[in-house]
Amino acid sequence: GGCCSYPPCAVSNPQHC
């Protein structure tokens, strides 16, 4: 959920996802 479910955010934060 959250950022990792939103592709641009997941791509920008791979260390989080």
From Swiss-Prot:
Q: Is Cell inner membrane tagged as a keyword?
A: no
Q: Does the keyword Aminoacyl-tRNA synthetase apply?
A: no
Tissue expression summary: Expressed by the venom duct.
Per the record, which residues fall in region Ser-Xaa-Pro motif, crucial for potent interaction with nAChR?
5-7
Q: Where in the cell is it found?
A: Secreted
The UniProt entry lists the main location of this chain as secreted
Q: List the disulfide bonds.
A: C3-C9, C4-C17
| Keywords, sorted A to Z | Acetylcholine receptor inhibiting toxin, Amidation, Disulfide bond, Ion channel impairing toxin, Neurotoxin, Postsynaptic neurotoxin, Secreted, Toxin
Gene Ontology molecular function: any one: toxin activity
List Cysteine amide occurrences by residue. C17
An example of a Gene Ontology cellular component annotation for this protein is: host cell postsynaptic membrane
The record's note on its domains: The cysteine framework is I (CC-C-C). Alpha4/7 pattern.
Q: What function is annotated for this protein? A: Alpha-conotoxins act on postsynaptic membranes, they bind to the nicotinic acetylcholine receptors (nAChR) and thus inhibit them.
Q: What family does the database annotate?
A: Belongs to the conotoxin A superfamily.
Name of the molecule in the record: Alpha-conotoxin-like Vn
* Protein's organism: Conus ventricosus (Mediterranean cone)
